């Protein structure tokens, strides 16, 4: 029987040429092979792929159609044709070809994912989710599917049923893939967990304290998604906060036998990790405080017949206190510590040593800077566990072509190995993301807080990031670096300075001509409910104690005012340092569009576009209508008045010098 396609080795050689972008060679060799293999549908499909990679889409379509003439049941060519039509903007033909590919191969993961992407781009999220579900059922480890899945989760996806299949997919996403900050999918995860009938029942109980604690803990110990998620991320949901707080109280008062504890310890230790991550933000009753003191005395005096009970009591304490530097640990055999306590103790010691290695640019003399520094030394911001890395670093050119900004002047050759400054890096989450976003980049990250920098440095070691140089410095002293940068990112920073203009002037001075700067500034309209709370309801405004922070959280939780109640929906409400940063910051400015225009004009920066407005948000505000110039900052004032929540996080945008 005649072979219509070349041998496997020959085909692999052609694929290798394509992967190495040797397009001319690939075309020449394929056309030569077609002299012998005239009816090779594979070779015609391959030629289409090569031309598509060269952006010659018309030729690509011609060769794909020739392949179909030779074999109209070859699913790959329909998928490739669909991709080409989607690049040309012909969504109708793209969909029909993906659907044809699926009809020929019902297990075609890539075609399902490509179809899901089209629905996602059209903001038809329910259909996108259906296609993606099918793709993930076939291959739950397919990266493209996981990226789209996390994008859908970031939209606060509402699950309509208790589909436990997604438990394993989300666990896979947050444990094996570093492509999403878990905090961004927290609401979607909470929504899915609420569909579990047993958890839903617990959430709706009038008084959980009347239930059998051990039975409740066994129910929670069986939910692997709940356990895995609360180990790595604060669960930003008020219903779950109330539930977990009540269960914590049950745990500290329950007299566990060793075997009983072992049955439910996975959940209890996970709850300890949750409390550590949210910085023990839950209220503590007087009776709980008394019980904590009782357990501490018991440990100090070593009143135990069985060593296992020491470990149980230590775990109970870790639900209420950060034990990483506790004197109690010196009283106990280290073999008794659970893995979580061992981990936070090691992390504390590592950060202590890292502080000695972080260079200091200068002594901070500015009074406001010192107040801000004190806040972040007390409450390093934010505490996080998992980063969101870019899968494949991009050149500066490709990055700015990918995001929706308009750059008036840019010589990309000057940015081949970009020098990047993160001005106000905090605990490093943003810095790590940036360091993996830009190809061949060198990142300098500065912050006032040494505790925050040590946290950031530890995270770099954990995730093997080696292109970031951390320095302790006041932004006002950055000229002492004697260095200029191609890109500066300063998100959520200069609005915490006494005069934001002074800070921006410094940043512009050390930015190269034609360089780019990303700024993030609070919106007075977007944060109107926070400002209203401060003005009308906040108690003891200059008292930054844990007790007062919790007292004011309770005012918000118990408020009958619907505007004030919306503050609970902020992620920042659900951890102590973030709540302090949001409500009790020692220095804060809130902006509006006219004030930003004035600020940028003063330093000669050109507005290039917002970086934190997804198509989902733009659709809500009907921004994509014809005639609206989104690159004119003055146009956004009216938009924000009509849609006051559009910048509820902050204004985040790129400018050019």
Task: Please identify what each model-predicted range represents.
Residues 130, 137, 141-371, 415, ...:
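N-terminal accessory segments
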Residues 40, 74, 108, 141-142, ...:
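Residue-level recognition of tetratricopeptide repeat
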Residues 516-565:
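Conserved class I S-adenosyl-L-methionine
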Residues 15, 42-53, 76-87, 110-117, ...:
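Conserved alpha-helical positions within TPR/SEL1-like repeat arrays
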Residues 552, 558-657:
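Rossmann-like AdoMet/SAM-dependent catalytic core
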